[in-house]
Amino acid sequence: MKKIIVFSDIHLNSATDETLENSSQKLEEAIAHLQSNHNDFDTLVFTGDLANSGKTDEYKALRNLVSTIDKPIKFMLGNHDNRENFLDIFPDYRPDHNGFLQSNESYEYFDFIFLDTLKDPYDDIPISCGYLCQKRLEWLAGKLKEAANKKVILFMHHPAFTTGMQAMDRLRLKNSHDFFSSIKSFDNVHHLISGHIHRNISGLYEGYNFSTFKSVNQQMVLKFKADS
């Protein structure tokens, strides 16, 4: 069994923002804690919103902060990220043949699949929502087919499920119906892991186990009713 560590929504920022002014320090402390207490981990997964504004300087700061980690890292993108700027600073991260930052890792009994839910400029959805276009869904279907005899854990920034927090549920994966229609064609999806919500939540949705994780940077207020 692999030991996977998840860091979610680190929101490194290069601008002055009182709520994020210690973002680099918080990530540095999280990495130090990881290396002191869980250094037997196999992979560190960042579930998106690596940067707060998607600026090159923010990704440079991230590159410097993770330079002390000598084990595999999987970076994923969220709605605060910029795909082009990220790839400029992390050129070793190759997008798939459609230009999206999607990948998979195959093990004896499990496969991990990492999805790119960052909207493209031509996706006609609200700016903070997630989206999986037909190309991304077809890529996912291909990977699920390859892993037919294994359990699959899907990682994605935007949750496809609802949490009861109305304001955040409005900003989830916009075409979650298409997503669930796609994965229900297979019987090997074991767990859905997401970021975006900035809280630890787990449950069952559409028959699938799911988990979200709190932000390394700042937590979301547990508020179920959205402001009108």
Can you describe what each PLM-predicted range is?
Residues 9, 48-49, 78, 115, ...:
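Active-site glycine-centered loops adjacent to acidic/histidine catalytic or metal-binding residues
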Residues 30-43, 126-209:
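His/acidic metal-ligating clusters that form di-metal
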Residues 50-52, 79-83, 119, 160, ...:
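Solvent-exposed loop/turn segments at secondary-structure junctions
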Residues 13-17, 84, 121-126, 162-166, ...:
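A short acidic, helix-capping loop that chelates divalent metal ions and anchors anionic groups
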Residues 1-61:
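N-terminal active-site segment of His-dependent metallophosphoesterases
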Residues 56-146, 178-188, 206, 211-214, ...:
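Extended active-site neighborhood of metal-dependent phosphoesterases/phosphodiesterases
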Residues 18-33, 182, 200-228:
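Binuclear metal-dependent phosphoesterase catalytic core
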